[in-house]
Amino acid sequence: MKIYNHKVESFFASSPAAQFAKTLPGGKSGTLVAAIWAELGDAQGRWESSRHLQAEAGAVPVTKASGKSRVVHFRFACNKHLRYTMYWFSFVSLNHSEWAKLYYRGQRDNGHSHHQALRALGAKWLKIIFVMWRDHKPYDENYHLANIARQKMRQAA
């Protein structure tokens, strides 16, 4: 298994995407970030927006509405490998990212289960990863924290 992991890591390191993908929390070692990028592929027009990527990964629920009834439930039709990879990436990010830890704690405080909170965190990460993948830009924790602060200021105004 160690040999396999080493081969995956070395193959991914030679990829052009590795230079910015490895900037994700926990991306410097292991095969988790490589697995995410393998699922994303290199077809730039594959998803129109981060919302489409989130749906592909099963990170957002399905809403069925008819007349006065409205039901929201877990998304079963999705890329299971990407969903599983994002679930574990979200879990790992709790140890490497302060905002991720705070977001997860906020979800738990709102009554969500551990799994629901990780899926919600995965949806947040997919927005960030989509922009990184589309624009070939590295992840910058400080830039993301500044965006969060700007959004909170807009909501308060």
Summary of predicted features, one role per range:
Residues 1-157:
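A detector of single, family-specific signature residues
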